[in-house]
From Swiss-Prot:
Disordered, as annotated region: 1-21, 370-404, 446-482, 513-545, 585-618, 683-771, 1177-1210
Natural source organism: Mus musculus (Mouse)
Function: Cooperates with AGTR2 to inhibit ERK2 activation and cell proliferation. May be required for AGTR2 cell surface expression. Together with PTPN6, induces UBE2V2 expression upon angiotensin-II stimulation.
Coiled coil: 876-1171
UniProt cross-references to InterPro entries, sorted A to Z: MTUS1/CCDC69
UniProt modified residues of type Phosphoserine: S375, S380, S393, S621, S1143, S1164, S1185, S1195, S1199, S1201, S1203, S1204, S1208
Similarity remark: Belongs to the MTUS1 family.
Keywords: Cell cycle, Cell membrane, Coiled coil, Golgi apparatus, Membrane, Mitochondrion, Nucleus, Phosphoprotein
GO cellular component: cytoplasm; Golgi apparatus; mitochondrion; nucleus; plasma membrane
Biased composition (Basic and acidic residues): 370-379, 446-455
Name of the protein in its database record: Microtubule-associated tumor suppressor 1 homolog
Compositional bias annotation for Low complexity: 524-534, 1195-1210
């Protein structure tokens, strides 16, 4: 119904449904700690108190893991029931102990399991143990359960006060451990378990005011619809306790520790007369999951049925799956029938301590007497008791899913069948069972072999690989478990196929079983490699319970002949033929043709009409079809493949007119996926209860006429009626959705190139059925019709073909099983009216018509699957053609490669020759270069020596010439320099003298102007001070005047006050005068306040006036100072102009000085010429020359010095 069923939780838990003698159902979830921590269940019965049953789950200390469970705090809740309204005096006490370590929601990290004793007192505390306290939850009208926290240990005590004997039943069940915590199994196996269980304690109050507090796990995935506790008068009590456990394999051959035990159930007689082990089941189911793989939900459940036979209204205590879990494993074991007289005709298979090495296995034994079970499921009760032994092995390995049959001596014999397992089998699996009543049997499955740490099993998070035997065998086991005394237990177990998410792997599920030996002989039982969900077929009459199963088992064994065909056309013919056969069977079922010729024909008329015998025939046909498929496609599964099994249970709400009946409908999907070995059991919330009224199908009723009449409760009709109508609407809408979008044959082929298997979704929803049994119609509503199987990684090898064939097989089985998936097997009294049968027949016809349309839809889907298969063949042919082309290209390329190699050899030889020639040439070249270098060096040295000689000679000549000239120039320059220095010093002194005079004049003028400005400033300051003093005096005078006026006014006020006081005294008796006086006083006060304010304002005005005067004076002063500053600026400007003029004059003087220096130079040159002439000239007049030359030399100097003005420094 809900697509998010697999997404709601990732945990595994159990939902327990408990019934008292008044058929008051109660539910609770419990999670199993033994999913990581192995648990051993010990059941104790006393012959004195034969109904006392103790089921103790003890944690197996053999498992070596990093964490263990610490459960020290017990949470006890007693469920007290009043006296039953029947001829039995019953007192029901349900005590549930939940040992809690912490309050955090359902976080349990268990690695090192400890012993959990029967009293649930001691569990060794270890790290990271988190349990949640158990919180009560009440069933609401909207069918939602309020969730509490996860109980870790549940102990149910029920004490019955009966006429025959009293019965005390104590169930101690362990909860699922949390997912997400590593379980370190020996052999490098790490188990990661996550648990997000939200516990649901469902407290329900029956109409007769009996109190039922129920604890359980609510996964928030389903709304359990109208789960009403209906009191009945049949005194049948059913306990359904589901336990998710890792089962322990007890095999001496394999020395792997880390054994996980499902439970040991012992029957113990305290009087010492008889003390035997009724059933001991040690089953190992370890989930191996590759990293990063998502898997659908799974559930682990353990089912115990204990029936007290001496009373005609016996009590059934059944631990049945009643939870929907996403990550876990579904391990269903049933407790043998326990009778009051101490006799238990139990068929408990004992695994021989054999050589098998099964990776994940399951043994399921359902042994029930036929109490009327009230359950809210799709289907009704099943009359016969069932025993289902299922060995679940992992894909990829040839294991031994065993099948159980009946030997000549009445014992059960297990035939070895080959199963697919993921781990290699060291020795061929050999499993044999011998099932006899009241004998100590032990299930010994092989321990876990050494596994990779990489393939860490996610016990709750990954799919479980558990192949189960064919359903033909399960039907025989169903019939064989109950002896002559077992007459009262019916288990409604209808597998509801959920093909929502199925990979293209081997997928198979069980179908309904035939009840007659003749039908079993006609139908070959398939050899199921993937596993099949145990669904007990229509129950036989009680007289045939011990005889019919053996013949059925033999007939089914004879019919199991694998047909080996490998051709594709043969496979398609098989598919079409099987589809036609299924169609004919469904049509016969819809027409209600009886085909059962058993001794119980009187009680099975309606059973035959519902098509229960055809279920077996269809089962046989599907089985043969599956055998043929196995023969056609014998593909070896790889070790990485995984077999995914999903149990889906549906809850259907039944109308109160028919009583609320819950059928147990586990649906098993097995999928072989590569890259991992995964085990998952997904139990879609399965409600098991005892029906308060007569069953819907009278043909399936037992020989008890009283059990139906006692359960008739008209009081509940008014309560459950509207809810039943609502359920009917919901079921109609859901059935339409299932017929349209979620058909069981939607096959999605595997994409082999990507290495991942696409999800093949199969989902089958049974249409709504309305059954009428005497009083009113019975509506069955599928509550959880589908489960999700997540994508598993697969290698693109052979299993893809096999998965496709098995997908067709599962679809074929879904087609066969859908018309009968809603068959209701209940107990009806033999005195049912014929009118009721006719009404039921009409309803069945309408149902079959609706189902015939669904079958046509399935045919269409099958044809589509055939077309898809043909498309796959075309793709394969295309790939083969491409492969041939690639081979051709490979040949051509190989030839080219050979030719290229030859060329390479020739080229390499030529290259070697060339390298040798190059080496010779290089040596010759180096010798020649060396010779040239030597010759060049000799020539260069000779030329260098010559150049040095020439250079040195020339340098000596030039140096001598240069030295002579340099001396001459030095003497001349020295003379000129001395002359210039003397002239410059004279001019400098003159300029400095003139400049100092000018500076002194400027200083004098500045001082005079500054003194004048200071004088004027002082005069202004004095005048301002005088004005200020005058104004202060005037203001003081005004202040004095105001003060005098104020004093006068105060005196007047005082006199007036005195007058008013006198007046008040005179007119004290006049109220108006008093009022006026008060007014005057108030006015005076106001006037005083105003006067004060005015005075303050006057003071402020005075200050403001003073400030104004000061400001005006300051403004005037500021103006004056600004004027003075402007005058000073003007003077500075004048000084600047004068300094500029002086600088220009100085520049002119410098120019004239330069001119004079030039003239001096010229004169000196002339002087030198004259001197030279004197030395070299005429000797006659030597005296004239110096005098004449001295005069011109001096005259220009003197003229220049006197004419040049003095230059003052700037």
């Amino acid at each position: 119904m809900n697509d998010d069923n697999s997404d709601r939780t990732e945990d595994g838990s159990r939902y327990v449904f408990i019934r008292d003698k008044n058929s008051n159902p109660s539910e609770y979830y419990q999670t199993s700690l033994s999913a990581q921590c192995p648990s051993v269940s010990h059941g104790d019965w006393n012959s004195d108190n034969p109904d006392a049953m103790v089921v103790d789950y003890e944690m197996d200390p053999a498992v070596d893991s990093s964490e263990s469970v610490s459960l020290s705090h017990q949470c006890v809740e007693e469920l007290a029931y009043p006296e039953p309204s029947s001829d039995f005096m019953g007192k029901h006490e349900f005590t549930m102990y939940s040992e809690l370590t912490c309050q955090s929601p359902a976080l349990v990290n268990t690695g090192k399991p400890q012993d959990l004793h029967s009293n649930c007192d001691s569990l060794e505390a270890i790290q990271d143990e988190k349990f949640d306290p158990l919180k009560p939850c009440e069933c609401r009208s909207d069918d939602d359960y309020a969730c509490g926290d996860s109980p870790e240990v549940l102990e149910l005590k029920q004490t019955y006060g009966m006429k025959v004997d009293t019965a005390n039943y104590t169930f101690i069940a362990r909860h699922d451990i949390e997912q997400g915590q590593p379980l370190h199994a020996p052999g490098g196996l790490q188990t990661t378990v996550r648990d997000r269980n939200a516990l649901s304690s469902c407290g329900r109050t029956p109409p007769h005011s009996s109190k039922m507090y129920v604890r359980g796990v609510n996964y928030n995935r389903e709304n359990f619809e109208n789960l009403q506790a209906t009191p009945s008068k049949t005194l049948n009590t059913t306990f359904t306790v589901i336990s998710d456990v890792l089962m322990q394999t007890d095999s001496p051959d394999v020395g792997v520790q880390g054994q996980n035990s499902l439970g040991n159930v012992t029957k113990e007689y305290t009087d010492g007369t008889r003390r035997g082990l009724i059933g001991e089941k040690e089953i190992q189911a370890v989930t191996l999951v590759s990293d990063g793989m998502e898997v659908p939900n799974g559930s682990a459940s353990q089912e115990f049925y204990c029936v007290s036979e001496d009373d005609p209204n016996s009590e059934t205590h059944s631990h049945g799956p009643y939870a929907q879990q996403e990550m876990g494993q579904n391990l269903r074991g049933t407790l043998p029938n326990c009778h009051v007289d101490g006799e238990c005709p139990v068929l408990v298979p004992a695994f021989e301590k054999s050589k098998t090495r099964v990776l994940g296995s399951e043994c399921k034994v359902t042994v029930t007497e036929d109490p009327h079970i009230d359950s809210h499921d799709n289907d009704s009760d099943i009359q016969s008791s069932t025993e289902e032994l299922t060995l679940r092995s992992v894909s990829g390995q040839r294991g031994s899913p065993y099948e159980m049959g009946w030997g000549e001596n009445g014992g059960a014999i297990c035939t070895d069948k080959a199963g697919c397992m993921s781990t290699p089998v060291e020795q061929p699996p050999n499993l044999s069972f011998r099932l006899e009543p009241a004998e100590v049997k032990k299930y010994n499955n092989v321990e876990n072999g050494p596994r990779d740490a990489k393939r860490a099993p996610n016990l709750k998070g990954e799919p479980t690989n558990m192949p189960k035997p064919n359903l033909g065998k399960s039907a025989t086991k169903t019939n064989t478990t109950v002896g002559s005394k077992v007459r009262k237990t019916e288990i409604i177990s209808y597998p509801t196929p959920n093909f929502k998410n199925i990979k293209a792997k081997v997928i198979s599920r069980s179908v309904l079983q035939p009840k007659d030996t003749s039908i079993m002989k006609d139908t070959p039982s398939p050899q199921v490699t993937g596993g099949s969900s145990p669904s007990p077929g229509p129950s036989k009459h009680l007289t045939m319970m011990n005889k019919a199963p053996r013949s059925d088992f033999k007939a089914s064994k004879k019919a199991e002949i694998p047909i080996n065909k490998t051709h594709k056309q043969q496979f398609n013919k098989l598919i079409t033929s099987q589809a036609a056969q299924v169609t004919t069977h469904s049509k016969n079922a819809s027409l209600g043709v009886p085909r059962t010729t058993s001794a119980t024909k009187s009680n099975q008329e309606n059973v035959d009409k519902t098509g229960s015998p055809h279920a077996g025939s269809e089962t046989g046909s599907v089985a043969a079809f599956f055998q043929k498929i196995k023969g056609i496609l014998p593909v070896k599964m790889k070790s990485s493949e995984c077999l995914e099994v999903t149990y889906v249970s549906h809850i259907d709400q039944i109308s109160p007119e028919k009583g609320e009946q819950d059928g147990e409908a586990p649906m098993e999907k097995q999928e072989l996926g590569k890259q991992a070995t995964n085990e998952i059991f997904e139990s879609k919330s399965l409600l098991v209860g005892s029906a308060p009224k007569t069953s819907t199908t009278p043909g399936r009723s037992s020989s008890k006429p009283d059990s139906r009449s006692l359960r008739k409760t008209p009081g509940l009709k008014a309560k459950v009626g509207p809810t039943a109508a609502c359920l009917r609407r919901k079921s109609e809408s859901r059935t339409l959705g299932s017929d349209r979008a979620l058909s069981p044959q939607r096959i999605r082929r595997v994409s082999g190139s990507g290495g991942h298997a696409a999800i093949n979704k199969y989902e089958e929803k049974p249409p709504k059925q309305a059954f009428q049994n005497g009083s009113g119609p019975l509506y069955l509503k599928p509550l959880v019709p589908r489960a999700h199987s997540h994508l598993l990684k697969t290698s693109p090898k052979g299993p893809s073909r096999k998965s496709l064939f098995t997908a067709f097989n599962s679809v074929e089985k879904g087609r066969q099983k859908n018309p009968r998936s809603l068959c209701i097997q209940t107990q009806t009294a033999p005195d049912v009216l014929s009118s009721e049968r006719t009404l039921e027949l009409a309803q069945y016809k309408t149902k079959c018509e609706s189902q015939s349309g669904f079958i046509l839809h399935l045919r269409q889907l099958l044809s589509r699957g055939n077309t898809k298969f043909e498309a796959l063949t075309v793709v394969i042919q295309h790939l083969l053609s491409e492969r041939e082309e690639a081979l051709k290209q490979h040949k051509t390329l190989s030839q080219e490669l050979v030719s290229l190699r030859g060329e390479l050899v020739a080229a390499s030889s030529a290259c070697e020759k060339l390298e040798k020639a190059r080496a010779d040439l290089q040596t010759a070249y180096q010798e020649f270069v060396q010779k040239l270098n030597q010759q060049h060096q000799t020539d260069r040295t000779e030329l260098e020596n010559r150049l040095k000689d020439l250079y040195t000679a020339e340098c000596e000549k030039l140096q001598s010439i240069y030295i002579e000239e340099a001396e001459k120039y030095k003497t001349q320059l020295q003379e000129q320099f001395d002359n210039l220095n003397a002239a410059h010093e004279t001019t400098k002194l003159e300029i400095e003298a003139s400049h100092s005079e000018k500076v002194e004049l400027l200083k004098k003028t500045y001082e005079t102007s500054l003194s004048e400005i200071k004088k004027s400033h002082e005069m202004e300051k004095k005048s301002l001070e005088d004005l200020l003093n005058e104004k202060q005096e005037s203001l003081e005078k005004q202040i004095n005047d105001l003060k005098s006026e104020n004093d006068a006014l105060n005196e007047r006020l005082k006199s007036e006050e005195q007058k008013q006081l006198s007046r008040e005294k005179a007119n004290s008796k006049n109220p108006q005068v008093m009022y006026l006086e008060q007014e005057l006083e108030s006015l005076k006060a106001v006037l005083e306040i105003k006067n004060e304010k005015l005075h303050q304002q006057d003071m402020k005005l005075m200050k403001m006036e003073k400030l104004v005067d000061n400001n005006t004076a300051l403004v005037d002063k500021l103006k004056r100072f600004q004027q003075e500053n402007e005058e000073l600026k003007a003077r500075m400007d004048k000084h600047m102009a004068i300094s500029r003029q002086l600088s220009t004059e100085q520049a002119a003087l410098q120019e004239s000085l330069e001119k004079e220096s030039k003239v001096n130079k010229r004169l000196s040159m002339e002087n030198e010429e004259l001197l030279w002439k004197l030395h070299n000239g005429d000797l006659c007049s030597p005296k004239r020359s110096p005098t004449s030359s001295a005069i011109p030399f001096q005259s220009p100097r003197n003229s220049g010095s006197f004419s040049s003005p003095s230059i003052s420094p700037r």
